[in-house]
């Protein structure tokens, strides 16, 4: 497959020792370990770009490297084979992925992958909160156990998807996109995956035309920096607290408290990724949104996005510099 997905502007390593590439990937893309072949001196290459909540990565280890991951915890991996092949083992199965195929790893999927010497991949790391949000935005029902996809897919299932990724890469490398634009692209990718790939999400429309739910969600969006009580939400929805829980479980796949917390975290991340926001400190913005326990805030943020808020802010300042 010959597609321009990240160019020299995003180059991190070329002719590099595979362990150096692996260390970088562990920091930004996903926890794993590698095993090198006994003979030869593989030379790895890596391109990487952060685009809002997405990590975009083009990687080649330059040798028959085995990659083992215990799981991604809070993120999904889309791995598109560009060159060579990759042997995947999981769920008691194995398959040789070739160019034109896509491997999709769920947050709790363990991965055992063996690259061919000429294998090159393009990887998108997508936080689970983005897919949860896409479910809510499209009025689809998220299963209680979380969204899960099958592992094996063909890009022909995703009409125009590779062109969308090319557009995202171009946007990431050539423009200073506003956080809203970055969030929009991430939402499109998530919706595209949910719409066109097999998953356990029911796309039956639940909340369309439900004025109570829409009224509550709008109130939350307008008051993210305030302390929002469940009693106030129940009053707005004109129902009991128990019915409010059922409403959120049905239309958002989570509790009102978790929904509010996730929206606060998403808003904070957008600010940290926005150079024009002039964020002075993590503590200040956390307190602005009502997170009084800073240690718990940092842990919630990392669970949602796979990195600490200080990492997000540092990367934003690095890109501006």
From Swiss-Prot:
Alphabetized Pfam families for the sequence: AraC_binding_2, HTH_18
GO CC list: cytoplasm
DNA-binding region(s) from the entry: 231-252, 282-305
InterPro entries noted in UniProt: AraC-bd_2, AraC_XylS_family_regulators, Homeodomain-like_sf, HTH-like, HTH_AraC, HTH_AraC-typ_CS
GO BP term (any one): catabolic process
Coiled coil: none
Keywords of the record: Activator, Aromatic hydrocarbons catabolism, Cytoplasm, DNA-binding, Plasmid, Transcription, Transcription regulation
Subcellular localization(s) per the UniProt record: Cytoplasm
Stretches assigned to the HTH araC/xylS-type domain: 214-315
Highest rank taxon of the organism: Bacteria
GO molecular function, a single term: sequence-specific DNA binding
Entry function: Regulatory protein of the TOL plasmid xyl operons. XylS activates the xylXYZLTEGFJQKIH operon required for the degradation of toluene, m-xylene and p-xylene.
The protein's name: XylDLEGF operon transcriptional activator
Lineage: Bacteria, Pseudomonadati, Pseudomonadota, Gammaproteobacteria, Pseudomonadales
């Amino acid at each position: 497959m010959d597609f321009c997905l990240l160019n020299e502007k995003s180059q991190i390593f070329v002719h590099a020792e595979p362990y150096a590439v692996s260390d970088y990937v562990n920091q930004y893309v996903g926890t794993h370990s590698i095993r090198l072949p006994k003979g030869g001196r593989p030379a790895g290459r890596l391109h990487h770009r952060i685009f809002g909540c997405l990590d975009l990565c083009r990687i080649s280890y330059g040798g028959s490297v085995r990659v083992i991951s215990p799981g991604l915890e809070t993120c999904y991996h889309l791995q598109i084979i560009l060159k060579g092949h990759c042997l995947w083992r999981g769920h008691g199965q194995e398959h040789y992925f070739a160019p034109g195929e896509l491997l999709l790893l769920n947050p709790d999927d363990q991965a055992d992958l063996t690259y061919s010497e000429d294998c090159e991949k393009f990887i998108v790391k997508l936080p689970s909160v983005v897919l949860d949000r896409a479910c809510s935005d499209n009025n689809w029902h998220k299963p209680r156990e979380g969204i899960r996809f099958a592992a094996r897919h063909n890009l022909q299932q995703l009409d125009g998807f590779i062109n969308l990724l090319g557009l995202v890469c171009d946007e990431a490398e050539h423009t200073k996109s506003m956080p809203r634009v970055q969030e929009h692209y991430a939402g499109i990718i998530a919706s595209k995956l949910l719409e066109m790939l097999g998953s356990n999400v029911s796309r039956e429309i639940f909340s369309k035309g439900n004025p109570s739910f829409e009224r509550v969600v709008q109130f939350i969006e307008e008051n993210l920096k305030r302390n929002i009580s469940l009693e106030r939400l129940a009053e707005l929805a004109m129902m009991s607290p128990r019915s409010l829980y059922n409403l959120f479980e049905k239309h958002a796949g989570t509790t009102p408290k978790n929904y509010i917390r996730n929206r606060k975290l998403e808003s904070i991340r957008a600010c940290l990724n926005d150079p024009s926001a002039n964020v002075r400190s993590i503590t200040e913005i956390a307190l602005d949104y009502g997170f009084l326990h800073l240690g718990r805030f940092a842990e919630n943020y990392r669970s949602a996005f796979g990195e600490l808020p200080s990492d997000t802010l540092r990367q934003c300042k690095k890109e501006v510099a």
